[in-house]
Amino acid sequence: MSKTTKQFQTEVKQLLDLVIHSLYSNRDIFLRELISNSSDAIDKIRFEAHSNEELLEGNSDWKIKLIPDKDAGTLTILDNGIGMTMAEVEENIGTIARSGTKAFMQALKDKSATDNPELIGQFGVGFYASFMVADRVILETRKGGTASDGCRWESIGDGSYTIEECSLDRRGTEIVLHLKDEFKEYLEEWKIRSIVKKYSDYIQYPVVMDITRTETPKGVDGEEIEGAGTIEKTVEETLNSMKAIWARPKSEVTEEEYQEFYKHISHDFENPFNTIHFSAEGISEFKALIYLPAKKPFDLFMADRKKGLQLYVKRVFITDRCEELLPDYLRFVKGVVDSSDLPLNVSREILQEDVQIKRIQKSLVGKILSTLAEVKEKNFDEYVNFWKEFGPVLKEGLHFDYANKEKLQELALFESTATEAGSFTSLKEYVERMPEAQQEIYFITGDSRATLKISPHLEAFKAKGYEVLFLTDPVDEWVVQALTEYKEKKLKAVDRGDVDLDSEEEKKEKETKQEEARKEYGDLISFIKSHLEDRVKDARLSKRLTDSACCLVADEYGINANMERILKAMNQPVPDSKRVLELNPDHPIMKIMTEIFRENKEDARLTDYADLLYDQALLTEGSPIKDPLRFTRLVSELMVKAATK
């Protein structure tokens, strides 16, 4: 195949432009990214060689070599990893088939992002960091097991690249960076050493470089030979310690080392919220270095998001995405697990069924949850910041992880009628504040605190001094299906079913008044129910309203307005369900409508008012009305009539 010139995908062109012109505060990370890519490539061939040893081609002296050439002005990164085919080169470099590309470019456009070039690794496009320091990049690669069918790729970062076949004896990848004049310092030994030490010291493969030293010859006694002159000697030196950070005692690892390793495996640019480093012995033996991030990633709720911990078996890399090590509600957790018990030829099927994996998962989950409980106890403000980022994900565990339900419900935080905006309460604190007469834990679900705070469903609870939890995350609708009780107190939705807040004594006092209201408004309510029969399941007098005229209430186990909105937003089918229209017997509109009804049951105002009440109930719960034009016309007519009386 002759040399072919191709255009980058549109997104890559935009990305290259941003990388070249916007990132400037820490260009050192280009080398970290390329070394990390080489390390990943060696990981992959070691793993694949378990089932196909021929891929090694007799070359298993793993290393990543850095070759600075001051005369040519080039820095070369060479590895003997898995390599790539021509198709893989085009797929991995010529295009970006990743949903996060636009989010990455938007982040770069933000002013703050120009000071955080580490973002480039976070979004999985680390190779392009080369163009921060180079005006020409050449890549030559051959995949293991493909004879001499190599590939040469070249670009000057102008939106196009050339690609052609080439003959390569060696397996792996070589990247040659033609450095811009202002970045020739990256050819200096001291500069390369400092970058490798800072960012790649823990890479488990040797990062090597030829070092030339001037020496005076020594005699057999080890002393320099007088008058012998000097000679130049070149040796290949290893620049990194290669000691797996998770295998070292905690006392020997500095905070800076923990933080740099986290950034290496996560491509995050912030320090982690918490670091968990421990060893497990007994039935299942493993070492783990686990990180809880400080900020949620942009793709946390994307279905195709890559997740899972890195898995090693006796220091041998197995996979960087072992999803079986943690449940899905902990998918934001980063880290490494190194097991002593799993077989080296472990397969995906084995991972899904292996009893050791299940034991490791149980231990990891327990350690993570206990760590969070400790932070919550000792530094609540810090924990609140973490909860704001990851609370919606952690709450998924209340629905799916029955074994850890009690631990998770102690970690859960909620806003409520008793907290300020942005402040939270736990279920334990809620129960401790409950008045003696209160029997249940009350909550309401919706899309925001602002909407829920003015909900008419809260009126009776406010009057009684009963606190109501605000559940504003979409996942909460599923959470409350599982979290039905806490400390023998049942959880009750204030917008579902009937409410019974009165004591027996209060019920007796109100019974006469309620009976009178039923007699006075019974016929009117029957009329309203009949008129709205295609929209409501029933109409009845309310025990929960004190100020508002009406509200809509779902059945005890029915679909409420918030669940309807969520299902529609997810393009899921919404079951046919009508709610109950509750009417406030103490509201003046009830007396007005009753007087009209007694005078003339055919009065058009009755149907207009019934429609207005229903639409009003929809609006107060945040639901759309079906005929906004008619609604506004009726309201306008009422305003005119009121003004001309």
Curated annotation (Swiss-Prot):
Chain intervals for the UniProt region annotation (B): 349-565
Domain of life: Bacteria
UniProt cross-references to Gene3D superfamilies, sorted A to Z: 3.30.230.80, 3.40.50.11260, Heat shock protein 90, C-terminal domain, Histidine kinase-like ATPase, C-terminal domain
Ranges where the record places region C: 566-645
Gene Ontology cellular-component annotations: cytoplasm
Matching Pfam families: HATPase_c_3, HSP90
MF terms in GO: ATP binding; ATP hydrolysis activity; ATP-dependent protein folding chaperone; unfolded protein binding
Subcellular location: Cytoplasm
Chain residue ranges for the region called A: 1-348
This protein's UniProt keywords: ATP-binding, Chaperone, Cytoplasm, Nucleotide-binding, Stress response
Family, similarity comment: Belongs to the heat shock protein 90 family.
NCBIfam families per the UniProt record, alphabetical: PRK05218.1 (NF003555)
Subunit structure: Homodimer.
PANTHER family, sorted: HEAT SHOCK PROTEIN 90 FAMILY MEMBER
Record function comment: Molecular chaperone. Has ATPase activity.
Protein name: Chaperone protein HtpG
Species of provenance: Pelobacter propionicus (strain DSM 2379 / NBRC 103807 / OttBd1)
UniProt lineage: Bacteria, Pseudomonadati, Thermodesulfobacteriota, Desulfuromonadia, Desulfuromonadales
Gene expressing this chain: htpG
